[in-house]
Amino acid sequence: NMPSLLYAAKSARAPYMLPAGPEAIDLSHQLLTIPVGTSATITFSATLDDTRYSSGSEPVQNIAAAEFYIDTPPWITATTPLPIAMTPADGNFDSSVEVVNGSLDASGLALGRHSVFIRGQDAAGNWGIVAAFFVDVVETESLYLPLVTHP
């Protein structure tokens, strides 16, 4: 089953720690390709779920925090990754499954591909499985906008 295989691959870095925290799933995002220098805000959301794959053997806690990182994942310690807080869609971190929202000012992003890493933490302090997506910053003339016509 594909979801279990993806979960195993994403948790392989710390297989006895990461599954204790919430998994970031169901990413939704806008503006994945933007011209360099554009003053645009990239908005995105994710669901943080502390109930997945527990089968009753793993305790379930409320989500306590959510954050994202640009270009450097949180487990890289050679540099200091900068966490940026995300907010709960309903205004409160008060359940074991939460939709969280984030926004990123794209005006400072350099030309090229950038990674955005999202993770959540439960009330017991466990950080969970990270999810990620790409944002491409391109030269203005190389921005491809498809033309759709109907016969």
Outline where the language-model segments fall:
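N-terminal pro-sequences and low-complexity stem/linker regions of secreted or lumenal proteins
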Residues: 1-3
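Proline/serine/threonine-rich low-complexity linkers at boundaries of modular beta-sandwich domains
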Residues: 5-27
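Conserved functional hotspot residues at active sites or interaction interfaces
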Residues: 146
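Short, solvent-exposed mixed-charge patches
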Residues: 150-151
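Long, low-complexity serine/threonine/glycine- and acidic-rich segments characteristic of extracellular
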Residues: 19-139
